[in-house]
Amino acid sequence: MELTPRDKDKLMLFTAGLLAERRKAKGLKLNYPEAIALISCEIMEGAREGRTVAEMMGAGREILTRDDVMEGVPEMIESIQVEATFPDGTKLVTVHSPII
């Protein structure tokens, strides 16, 4: 199987998102890379399922709370930008203050 560099990046992000999801399910607080990966992965999956950019911008703020992450992580993440594939093409989704 031949993957483009972009496909490899998406696969690595998805794998990191799965790991973060498992750790969250165990009750562990997520660190910075895990929080970014989980939110990004959820946005990419929502886009693939046919949700809109506006829906994903809103949903991106509901994935994690301060209680889900280590101290200081919410302040480190001012915004997240994810290039996601929607049914009508690839679009950039920006989520401001994703952890409230």
Swiss-Prot record:
EC number: 3.5.1.5
Keyword Hydrolase in annotation: yes
GO biological processes: urea catabolic process
Principal subcellular localization: cytoplasm
Location(s), subcellular: Cytoplasm
Keywords annotated in UniProt: Cytoplasm, Hydrolase
InterPro entries for this protein: Urease_gamma (IPR012010), Urease_gamma/gamma-beta_su (IPR002026), Urease_gamma_sf (IPR036463), Urease_subunit (IPR050069)
Pfam families linked: Urease_gamma
One Gene Ontology cellular component: cytoplasm
GO MF assignments: nickel cation binding; urease activity
ATP-binding among keywords: no
Catalytic reactions of this protein: urea + 2 H2O + H(+) = hydrogencarbonate + 2 NH4(+)
Pathway(s) of this molecule: Nitrogen metabolism; urea degradation; CO(2) and NH(3) from urea (urease route): step 1/1
Chain segments annotated as transmembrane: none
Root EC class: hydrolase
CDD domains attached to this UniProt entry: Urease_gamma (cd00390)
Signal peptide positions (record): none
Family statement: Belongs to the urease gamma subunit family.
Subunit structure: Heterotrimer of UreA (gamma), UreB (beta) and UreC (alpha) subunits. Three heterotrimers associate to form the active enzyme.
PANTHER family: UREASE
Record-given protein name: Urease subunit gamma 1
Encoding gene per record: ureA1
